[in-house]
Amino acid sequence: MRRDVNGVTKSRFEMFSNSDEAVINKKLPKELLLRIFSFLDVVTLCRCAQVSRAWNVLALDGSNWQRIDLFDFQRDIEGRVVENISKRCGGFLRKLSLRGCLGVGDNALRTFAQNCRNIEVLSLNGCTKTTDATCTSLSKFCSKLRHLDLASCTSITNMSLKALSEGCPLLEQLNISWCDQVTKDGIQALVRGCGGLKALFLKGCTQLEDEALKYIGAHCPELVTLNLQTCLQITDEGLITICRGCHKLQSLCASGCSNITDAILNALGQNCPRLR
């Protein structure tokens, strides 16, 4: 049996011919080159992959693709690109940003979820083709997910929050800003399964009422950051329940919540000593 060396099998090392070996390849062992490549960004890795056959294998090794941010290429990223990346990276990938990638939809993200089950941080901010089907896939395959950004994914509904609650119990940060189909029922389902939430961004979720905040206050004692900007139906009553249940709160944004009065300041002072 050929032993693995940092995810690259010995047989793959043996494929390098003498004619393919530059001086640096002869001086440095393949294991060290692989380690060096692990510090490079996506663009540099792709350039290295074109240098030689040896570097192609090393640069494209899945262990080098644990953190990928494709925002700079958002106009060029289509579903097939995400599928190919997920197949190459597999279980190595921990963090992926597809922010602003309008061409990525549910089918590609299902393939991604199936292949990248160790994903911990995922940004789909502005991926407007994303629907509840994507959250169902994440729930089914990505139980290690900790941070999820679904801001401006306006097709997201309560069904997504229910799915995340059932399959992503480690979730600590969720951004569903401008997902204006979400109601108190979705929040109720979410917090019952994701009680470890530390940051929740609900900016522009205009259907949320005080009852949604009561669920958060009752089930999210670890909450540190809460953004309720322009949640127009929120009143003092709802925010007071947050103050009483979320004593670790450090950041609260209620800008544009016109039904809030000075009474909330007293509740914050008494119950949230860490507020900045």
Curated annotation (Swiss-Prot):
<keyword id="KW-0433">Leucine-rich repeat</keyword>
<dbReference type="InterPro" id="IPR032675">
    <property type="entry name" value="LRR_dom_sf"/>
</dbReference>
<feature type="repeat" description="LRR 7">
    <location>
        <begin position="231"/>
        <end position="256"/>
    </location>
</feature>
<feature type="repeat" description="LRR 8">
    <location>
        <begin position="257"/>
        <end position="276"/>
    </location>
</feature>
<dbReference type="InterPro" id="IPR001810">
    <property type="entry name" value="F-box_dom"/>
</dbReference>
<feature type="repeat" description="LRR 2">
    <location>
        <begin position="101"/>
        <end position="126"/>
    </location>
</feature>
<dbReference type="InterPro" id="IPR001611">
    <property type="entry name" value="Leu-rich_rpt"/>
</dbReference>
<keyword id="KW-0963">Cytoplasm</keyword>
<dbReference type="GO" id="GO:0005737">
    <property type="term" value="C:cytoplasm"/>
</dbReference>
<dbReference type="GO" id="GO:2000300">
    <property type="term" value="P:regulation of synaptic vesicle exocytosis"/>
</dbReference>
<dbReference type="GO" id="GO:0098978">
    <property type="term" value="C:glutamatergic synapse"/>
</dbReference>
<comment type="subunit">
    <text>Interacts with SKP1 and CUL1.</text>
</comment>
<keyword id="KW-0833">Ubl conjugation pathway</keyword>
<dbReference type="GO" id="GO:0099575">
    <property type="term" value="P:regulation of protein catabolic process at presynapse, modulating synaptic transmission"/>
</dbReference>
<comment type="function">
    <text>Substrate-recognition component of the SCF (SKP1-CUL1-F-box protein)-type E3 ubiquitin ligase complex. Role in neural transmission.</text>
</comment>
<keyword id="KW-0677">Repeat</keyword>
<dbReference type="GO" id="GO:0045202">
    <property type="term" value="C:synapse"/>
</dbReference>
<protein>
    <recommendedName>
        <fullName>F-box/LRR-repeat protein 20</fullName>
    </recommendedName>
</protein>
<dbReference type="GO" id="GO:0001662">
    <property type="term" value="P:behavioral fear response"/>
</dbReference>
<feature type="repeat" description="LRR 4">
    <location>
        <begin position="153"/>
        <end position="178"/>
    </location>
</feature>
<dbReference type="GO" id="GO:0098793">
    <property type="term" value="C:presynapse"/>
</dbReference>
<dbReference type="Pfam" id="PF12937">
    <property type="entry name" value="F-box-like"/>
</dbReference>
<feature type="domain" description="F-box">
    <location>
        <begin position="22"/>
        <end position="68"/>
    </location>
</feature>
<dbReference type="InterPro" id="IPR006553">
    <property type="entry name" value="Leu-rich_rpt_Cys-con_subtyp"/>
</dbReference>
<dbReference type="GO" id="GO:0098685">
    <property type="term" value="C:Schaffer collateral - CA1 synapse"/>
</dbReference>
<feature type="repeat" description="LRR 6">
    <location>
        <begin position="205"/>
        <end position="230"/>
    </location>
</feature>
<feature type="repeat" description="LRR 1">
    <location>
        <begin position="74"/>
        <end position="100"/>
    </location>
</feature>
<feature type="repeat" description="LRR 3">
    <location>
        <begin position="127"/>
        <end position="152"/>
    </location>
</feature>
<feature type="repeat" description="LRR 5">
    <location>
        <begin position="179"/>
        <end position="204"/>
    </location>
</feature>
<dbReference type="Pfam" id="PF13516">
    <property type="entry name" value="LRR_6"/>
</dbReference>
